[in-house]
């Protein structure tokens, strides 16, 4: 960029700053004009305004305290601040408030003691509340109910948060286990590949790992107990059978078989078709039916 372009850009920036200053001045002037207009409108009396000075003085005389009224009815205390207080200074203003309240209390306390007026609350004073005990009991029960609801909602929220955290931890553990399993498989594959490259490629002498065949993930480890059916959860101790029961079971098994498909159990074969040893059993016809010739 050349020097002329820099100068032009600086001039443009100065012009922008001057425009901003002009806009701010115009806004301030417009605000001041608006305030002046409002002040003038407030200063001008309305067409329906009535200035009744005598009536105002009469009303002031009606609501003002009489000159001979007792001080106990007014309880007014005048405090000399000793000088002007800067209202913009927070510390000085608050100090003036505190001093005025303290000095006024001391002066009123002394006057009441001199007049012999009992203004302190006795020790056995019972201040009756505006609201009855029944109403306050209802308010108390409602507040306790709301507090209980808030606590229950907080407990439910904590339970949801704990459940969500438990799910996240469980999923993280599952991911870590899957990653660990994958790393183990990759390391074993890498080790075997290195053995093959080194000349040890005989797979007959290598042991079979459980995680490759999937046997480690089978339930029960593939072990079976003798004499226990696969669906027996009691381990063969659920229904102990007697010796006579075993004989009955053997006879039924020899007669009916051990279950399975029965669809072709009664189908004739060549041997059963040519077997006439048993003969034929002719049934007797009933008396109501005629015999076929």
From Swiss-Prot:
Q: Where in the cell is it found?
A: Nucleus, Nucleolus
Which parts pass through the membrane? none
Biological processes annotated in GO: ribosomal large subunit biogenesis
Task: Provide the alphabetized UniProt keywords.
Answer: Coiled coil, Nucleus, Ribosome biogenesis
Q: Which InterPro entries match?
A: Ebp2 (IPR008610)
Regions of biased composition (Polar residues) lie at 265-275
For molecular function, the Gene Ontology terms on record are: GTPase activity; RNA binding
One GO cellular component term noted in the UniProt record for this chain: nucleolus
At the top level of its lineage, which domain of life is listed? Eukaryota
Q: What is its main location?
A: nucleus
Q: Where is the composition biased (Basic and acidic residues)?
A: 150-167, 173-189, 247-256
Coiled coil ranges (UniProt) are: 135-190
- Keyword Nucleus present in the record's keywords: the answer is yes
Acidic residues compositional bias, start-end? 1-37
Give the residue ranges for region: Disordered. Answer: 1-45, 150-293
Q: Belongs to which family?
A: Belongs to the EBP2 family.
Q: Summarize the subunit comment.
A: Interacts with NSN1.
Function as written in the Swiss-Prot or TrEMBL entry = Required for the processing of the 27S pre-rRNA. Plays an important role in plant growth and senescence by modulating ribosome biogenesis in nucleolus. Associates with ribosomes.
Name-wise, this protein is Probable rRNA-processing protein EBP2 homolog
Q: Which gene encodes it?
A: EBP2
């Amino acid at each position: 960029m050349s020097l002329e372009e820099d100068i032009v850009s600086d001039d443009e920036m100065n012009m922008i700053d001057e425009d901003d200053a002009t806009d701010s001045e115009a806004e301030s002037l417009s605000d001041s004009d608006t305030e002046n207009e409002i002040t003038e409108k407030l200063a001008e009396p309305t067409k329906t305004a009535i200035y009744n000075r005598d009536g105002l003085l009469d009303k002031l005389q009606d609501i003002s305290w009489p000159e001979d009224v007792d001080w106990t009815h007014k309880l007014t205390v005048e405090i000399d601040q000793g000088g002007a207080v800067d209202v913009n200074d927070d510390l000085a203003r608050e100090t003036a408030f505190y001093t005025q309240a303290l000095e006024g209390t001391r002066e009123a306390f002394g006057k009441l003691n001199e007049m012999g007026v009992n203004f302190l609350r006795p020790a056995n004073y019972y201040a009756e509340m505006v609201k009855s005990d029944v109403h306050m009991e209802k308010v108390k029960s409602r507040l306790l109910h709301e507090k209980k609801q808030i606590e229950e909602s907080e407990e439910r929220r904590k339970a949801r948060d704990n459940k969500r955290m438990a799910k996240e931890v469980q999923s993280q553990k599952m991911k870590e286990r899957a990653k660990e399993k994958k790393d183990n498989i990759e390391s074993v594959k890498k080790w075997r590949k290195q053995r093959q490259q080194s000349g040890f490629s005989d797979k007959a002498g290598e042991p079979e790992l459980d995680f490759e065949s999937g046997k480690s993930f089978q339930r029960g480890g593939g072990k079976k107990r003798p004499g226990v059916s696969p669906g027996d959860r009691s381990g063969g101790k659920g229904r102990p059978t007697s010796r006579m029961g075993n004989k009955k079971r053997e006879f039924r098994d020899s007669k009916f078989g051990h279950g399975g498909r029965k669809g072709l159990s009664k189908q004739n074969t060549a041997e059963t078709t040519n077997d006439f040893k048993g003969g034929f059993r002719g049934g007797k016809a009933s008396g109501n039916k005629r015999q076929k010739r």
